[in-house]
Every structure is written in C-alpha cells, then in structure tokens.
Amino acid sequence: MIAREMIAEKVFAESVAKDIRNFLPEKYENAEFQVMQMNKNNGVQMIGVQVRLQEENVCPVVYVGSFFNEIRLGEPVEKVMNEIAKCMEEAGNAPFVHNGINPMDYDSVKEHLAVMLVNTQANKRMLQEMPHENIEDLSAICYVDFPVESNDGKATMKVKNEHLKMWNVDAKEMFHQARANTQPVNTPILQSMDEMMLSIFNEEGHATNLLDENVDFGFRSHDMLYALTNVEKQYGASMITQPEVLNKLEQLFPEGFYVLPSSVHEVLIVPDNGEMEPKMLGEMVREVNKNEVERQEVLSDRVYSYDKEKHQIRQEPDSIQQVKEMGR
C-alpha cells in the first residue's frame, strides 16, 4: 500500500472510530473504538478499528480496507457504516470471544499455543517485538490459537515480548509448551499430491496421511511430490520444524528430500531421486510466489534439504537467487 492510500484509509478509519457508535446497539454505548495499524506477515500493513468492551478480555479488530474501497466506488456512507457495524457485532459474538480464555493469563492460554514459521528478512521489524527462534533464513514464532466450537470464525494472537513479561514466562518454556500441545494445528499431515488431486475430483475419495503408523507407504513411494501441513491447514509449514516429523520423513525418503516453501500454511516435499536440481526447484518456488501466493502468505524464495547429521533443514545454495529476495 503506497503512503498516500494508507493516509486516506487511516483518515477513513478515524472517522469510523468516531461515528460507528451511532450504528451499533446500546451495549456499545460505553465501548472504546481505536484505530489500529497492524503489521502482518512479510511487512503487509492493515488498518482497522479495535472494539473494546469493558467486560471482555478479547478486543476484536475490523479491518476497513474493503469498506474504504466501497466508499471510493460511490457506495453511500450510511450503507457502508451499517456493514461495518454488522461486522463488529459478529466479531463480538464470535465463539472465541466467549470461550473463557484470558489472554492476560498464561495458564489460560498455554494449552492453545502453537508455532508459526515466517521469513526472517521480510519480518525484521515485527520480529523485534516477538520472541523467536531462527531456523536458517526463517524464524519460528508462537501464537495463541483460540478454539472455536463452530465455523463462524477463527482468531489467533501472535505472542509478543510484552506477553512474556506479563505472563512471567521465558521464551524457551513457551516454545516447549507450544510444540507439546496436541490441538489440530499441531497434528501433521503428509499427503501425496497425486492422491490429493484425485480426492478433489472424486467426492468419495480421500488423501491418506502418510505419517500414520499403520499406512503402507509402498506404491506411493514413487510419487514426485507430497504436501506437508497440519489438520487445519493453518500455518502448517511449521510442521517441518518438528523433530518427530523430520525423523518420519527421513524414514520415508532415505535417499533424502527437498523442502519447497509453498506458503506459511504448507511445504512441499520432493524426494531427492536425482531428477530435480535445487536451482530448478528454486526457480519454480519464486515463480509460484510471484504469481500464485498472497504476499503475506509467502514463506521463502529458497529451497531446503534435510541435514541428516544435524537433523534439521538447511538452505540449498544453488536454489538462492543472486538478488534481493522477499522484498516485493
């Protein structure tokens, strides 16, 4: 977003924060409305209005970008304000707001911690405010995955340094807890891309999780491409940082394997059978990132392989483009 557009959108957000109370029910009479400029993944900035009710621990944020575009296209202000008010009410009534979790209490949130993988260079500013672990050119951060009992919404909260101080917990303990948790976002899935495509077009079929102990890898071992994510397909690229997942991948692909960063939600596993070179794979990743992946969901422009001695992923030098990366 260029500076002029961001300023105009922020002015609009300030007018929303000032007047939106007039479009909301009586319970919002004493609510506080504050304009927030949020730094998302890979430097993407979004402007929203935060709603704070005295009796609530969670303060939903409604982003105003799409509503600002409606105004610029000529939609009546009153109509757009009513739409914003409706979004605020829905956010305030979402299951995660009333699930009894207090973000200020570590004991309340610790079982809902999970790990997210982001690009270090593209998130330098954000990472200054967050506890993180460096893994090659990537960084692991923690977030709270608020549970929901329906499909009405999803909420997460990235853990910042200020949270650790408030919780009186160190980063090492938090990361250990996050990786030990058993919620769906911590449950890895490895699927053959061939099976996944067949299951999409065949409603009766389904792709097998090849990490399950009772699955016969057998005939699937000759496939060229596999997708690794988690059950919820949310920030599933972090599964590649789990030691037990890497150990299982080493068993399935004893000849070695490459890791292609599809997005923050998924990585692709390519067996190292000598048919694909890191340079070619790196070019493929950059092409897909440029044309197919939303900027804030891009993980990396590089390819990784598995270091059997260190039991972790490492960058493949031949896959690295010799120009500035991730600065789109």
What are these regions (language model features)?
Residues 7-9, 25, 79-86, 290-292:
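Basic, alpha-helical nucleic-acid-binding regions used in initiation and control of genome expression
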Residues 231-328:
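C-terminal structured domains
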